[in-house]
From Swiss-Prot:
SUPFAM superfamilies to which the protein is assigned, alphabetical: ITPase-like
Domain of life the protein comes from: Bacteria
One family name in Pfam for this protein: Maf
Family membership noted in the UniProt record: Belongs to the Maf family. YceF subfamily.
EC number: 3.6.1.-
Active-site positions on this chain: D70
Transcription found in the keyword field: no
Protein name: 7-methyl-GTP pyrophosphatase
A molecular function (GO) term: nucleoside triphosphate diphosphatase activity
Feature type site, description Important for substrate specificity: F14, Q71, E155
Segments forming a coiled coil: none
Length: 194
């Protein structure tokens, strides 16, 4: 299946950087799907549905494997979104101080030729240090994590906020579980290492 094109259904520069680690040429497309949660939809159901929807929403004219991914952050059973501004980022980090949060990342690979979609969910736990208000404000002002779920960038200074990380793939926390992606691509006939 070496004639398949690899497409990332995302405009996220973070996901693009992660996919570049696999050293496979790929293109990106902006997915076109409604990301509104359904009534009574669990975080796991939401990320799986959205990952599949993103992968399937791209208009493709050649045989391609299209990657879709979606992530939510959950604290005390509630989905935490992107803060979008300083005040909300500080509020999120204050609520997360000394707490554990869970990231659920849905991943899907859609084969545009066969119509088959393979998907999975990866879970990653983040345990926050107890943080002072001054530490939180200093972090937010330095890194401005306004478009990151949970109000931090784990690939940057955000690592200073954590006491412990739990999960099989640290890439999951940034938004694209590469270990699972390698498996899903192999199931569709694309071997990362040839």
């Amino acid at each position: 299946m070496e004639n398949y094109q690899l497409v990332l259904a995302s405009t996220s520069p973070f996901r693009q950087q992660l996919l570049e680690k696999l050293a496979i040429p790929f293109s990106t497309l902006s997915p076109n799907c409604d990301e509104t949660p359904l009534e009574d939809e669990s975080p796991q159901q939401l990320v799986l549905r959205l990952a599949e929807s993103k992968a399937q929403s791209c208009q493709i004219n050649q045989p391609s494997l299209v990657i879709g991914s979606d992530q939510v952050c959950v604290i005390n059973g509630n989905i935490v979104g992107k803060p979008h501004n300083r005040q909300n980022a500080i509020a999120q980090l204050t609520a997360q101080s000394g707490q554990s949060i869970v990231f659920y990342t849905g991943l899907a690979v859609y084969n545009s030729e066969t119509g088959e979609t393979r998907s999975c969910i990866d879970e990653f736990k983040v345990h926050f240090r107890p943080l002072t208000q001054a530490q939180i404000e200093r972090y937010v002002d330095k890194e401005q994590p306004f478009y990151c779920a949970g109000s931090f960038k784990s690939e940057g200074l955000g690592i200073a906020l954590f006491e412990k990380l739990e999960g099989k793939d640290p890439n999951t926390l940034v938004g694209l579980p590469l270990i699972d992606l390698i498996d899903l691509l192999a199931q569709q006939g694309m071997q990362v290492l040839g």
